[in-house]
Amino acid sequence: MNILGIIFALLAGVFFGIIGPVTKTAYNLGAGIGLAIFLRYIIALIIVSPLIPNQQGLISTYKKHLGNFLLITLASIMLTTGLLISVTYINVSLTIIIFCTYPIIVLAISIFITKERIKNIIKFLFFTTFIGLFLALSPSTDDLKIQGIAFALLASFGAAIMIVTNQTMSKKNISAIHINIFINFFNTVFFFIMLSLFYKIDTNISINAFLILLIPSCSYAIALFLQLLAIPRIGQTNTALFLYLEPITGIFGAVLILNEKLTSIQLLGTAIVLISLAASTFVTKEIKNDFA
């Protein structure tokens, strides 16, 4: 049912949105970026591991569709590394604005490449949501650096490729659990090697910082799984649109957890996004499916 897919996509947006402000809280308590990345994937792998023995034909599925699995995993690496590096060059608000162009990229792919029939109202809601998001985040244009913009775009393309590839795989009846296992196993090994060679996984932190860092790690695992479940039900276009709830959740998290203040423009932008998402929910319920 469409309503179930909508719920999965919206919840994925909420859980993805939790990650930013809670992770920053852990950073403020002394946690490092390396540990945050490694925990994200190892916790997700631990959560999904009990399901592995019950997966029939797991290895044969990986062999048969290896290209798809490698592509979606590469996209997840683009997403993680792009966001991580971008914020070292430009401010967080601008990073999120650039990153959140990924639903527009998905929409373009849906229209021009996969040839989906997208209702004009859905196209309109995409752009009103993005405009609202731009106002809500109120980015500064000071000290723009091309490196930061490039890495934020890398993350955006990574997110878009993940969503589009996921839909392609769902049409081949590839389980969301199979995808989840592959991504998290591969990335656990990949980032452990990369961080060990070129960075540092600092475990010398307080117990409070460690426990708080577990929250975004678990949130990532839940959000990824919900996203993988949403796409086969409502399609890549609608899933991308509903994931706009992610930055709005991040804004509320920043206000509630980090005591940041919202300006009148940010409140207006937040209202536009929420109204657009509510309208999208209604429209999507009226449309059986956007994809063939």
Label every model-predicted segment.
Residues M1-L35, L39, T141-T168, A292:
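Glycine-/small-residue-enriched transmembrane alpha-helix faces in small-molecule transporters
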Residues V48, I118-S138, F191-F192, Y244, ...:
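Hydrophobic transmembrane alpha-helices of multi-pass small-molecule transport proteins
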Residues I3-F8, G34-P50, L125-T128, A150-L154, ...:
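Hydrophobic alpha-helical transmembrane segments of multi-pass integral membrane proteins
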Residues I47, I52, L83-I85, Y102-F127, ...:
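C-terminal transmembrane-helix exit sites in multi-pass transporters
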Residues L39, T95-T101, N166-N187, Y220-L256:
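Helix-helix packing/entry segments at the starts of transmembrane helices
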Residues G17, P21, T73, I77-T81, ...:
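Hydrophobic/small/kink-forming positions within alpha-helical transmembrane segments
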Residues G20, S49, Q55-S93, F99, ...:
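Specific transmembrane alpha-helical segments of multi-pass solute transporters/efflux pumps
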Residues A26, A36, R40, S86, ...:
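Hydrophobic/aromatic residues within transmembrane alpha-helices
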